[in-house]
Amino acid sequence: MQVSVRDNNVDQALRALKKKLQREGVFREMKLKQHFEKPSEKKAREKAEAIRRARKLARKKAQREGML
């Protein structure tokens, strides 16, 4: 991954790098890989995440329809 430093502004380049890494999910993956996760725990976590995403999507859809 590359980030260009313009006008010797390292702070801005670091912010851009952090944003790219966050978008790619690198920090989340590092956190998950710190400890071994049993397959059953992984399955339960992924199921909970899917439920959370579905609820969020339904909430956004309801809000959008209510606004129109």
UniProtKB/Swiss-Prot annotation:
UniProt-listed InterPro entries: Ribosomal_bS21 (IPR001911), Ribosomal_bS21_CS (IPR018278), Ribosomal_bS21_sf (IPR038380)
Pfam families: Ribosomal_S21
Gene source species: Ruegeria pomeroyi (strain ATCC 700808 / DSM 15171 / DSS-3) (Silicibacter pomeroyi)
One MF annotation (Gene Ontology) recorded for this entry: structural constituent of ribosome
Domain of life: Bacteria
Protein's UniProt keywords contain Ribonucleoprotein: yes
Gene expressing this chain: rpsU
GO BP annotations listed: translation
Family: Belongs to the bacterial ribosomal protein bS21 family.
Name the record gives this protein: Small ribosomal subunit protein bS21
NCBIfam families: S21p (TIGR00030)
